[in-house]
Amino acid sequence: MHNQYGSIFSITTWGESHGPAIGVVIDGCPAGLSLSPEDFLPAMARRRPGQLHTSPRQEPDLVTILSGVYQNKTTGTPISLLIENKDVSSSSYEHLQHCYRPGHAQFAYEGKYGFADNRGGGRASARETASRVAAGVIAKKILLSQGIETLAFLSGFGTLESKNYPKLSDSLIQQVHTSPFYTLLPQEEIQNLLLLNPDDSFGGVVSFITSPLPIGLGEPVFGKLPALLAAGMMSIPAAKGFEIGAGFSSSQMTGSAYLDAFIADESGVSLQSNRCGGALGGISIGQPLEGRVAFKPTSSIKKPCSSVLKDGTPIAYRTPNQGRHDPCVAIRAVAVVEAMLDLTLVDLLLQHRCTQL
């Protein structure tokens, strides 16, 4: 259950980290959208392991379109995408079958189901997010056709952090996409932290921004734009916090300091500031959407940690040297955050078209 996300534009992901393949089925995509396997390459490359300061697992992450596309056009029927797992190394996990890995979902999965696939995290692995990124490519194409641009970037790495939301532009997108860390932070400072802590891992923050959204995205009460975004973002493995606009810092403000004043000019009514993050009453108001997602440090580290065998015997657990893990999962989570943003916005955009005759 709960492998589906979205209402009108919905996705269902499937597969495990060390299975033969993972994939996603997209339902609700309008017909006539141009789509080819090459369209997936840039986004998949940003999430793909085996790059600088990410997991050394080598996965090409080539997307195969199985259905829903004919002559490079979507047909309006379900689109099925397949991504093969090419670099599986399950032997690294065989000796871990009898102990609990600190910080991993294995203990929870075994408690819930009575059985769990322990190879590389199974269904709980961040490998699953490759399917979301693939689906997000289709969502982004729809958004761009409606004049909506989106971007996610690494805004926090360990103690390094920037809370500013820059204005979205082509040059900003290019700057983020050409950075090895997908960030506006000083790259040499990130590299120094990694070099000084080779046996440890780091948490991070991923910010997301959009061009001004159409007024009306989001539904009252349980379908609010920030609420749906929070659900999508917090479903990403290792996500531990979400905020929109001023977020948690708004709790330390006075009303006079927080309120966004309305202004009007020849282009219409807008806000003087955007501490609300682009939504009032859970509905977009024509402003850019701005938010952040916090990610915990990767649990797989080379430093020893206390744990127990499944029979309760205490042990000193250490991640095996042959294991392949990210020093900071937030780096590759940039592409996933952007995908979840795109998937949420497309679904709400299509819902909004049903609001008025």
From Swiss-Prot:
Any GO BP: amino acid biosynthetic process
Q: Which GO terms describe its cellular component?
A: cytosol
Listed GO molecular functions?
chorismate synthase activity; FMN binding
Q: Does the keyword Lyase apply?
A: yes
Give the binding site residues for FMN: R123, A124, S125, G281, K296, P297, T298, S299, S300, R324
Q: Does the keyword Kinase apply?
A: no
Q: Tell me which PROSITE patterns the record gives.
A: CHORISMATE_SYNTHASE_1, CHORISMATE_SYNTHASE_2, CHORISMATE_SYNTHASE_3
The free-text note explaining how the cofactor binds reads: Reduced FMN (FMNH(2)).
**Keywords noted in UniProt:** Amino-acid biosynthesis, Aromatic amino acid biosynthesis, FAD, Flavoprotein, FMN, Lyase, NADP
Q: Which residues bind NADP(+)?
A: R47
Cofactor(s) named in the record: FMNH2
E.C. number: 4.2.3.5
Q: Which InterPro entries match?
A: Chorismate_synth, Chorismate_synth_AroC_sf, Chorismate_synthase_CS
PANTHER family for the chain: CHORISMATE SYNTHASE
The free-text function statement in the UniProt record for this protein reads: This reaction introduces a second double bond into the aromatic ring system.
- Please describe the quaternary structure of this protein: Homotetramer.
Indicate the family of this protein: Belongs to the chorismate synthase family.
What is this protein's record name? Chorismate synthase
Please name the source species: Chlamydia trachomatis serovar L2 (strain ATCC VR-902B / DSM 19102 / 434/Bu)
| Gene this protein is translated from | aroC
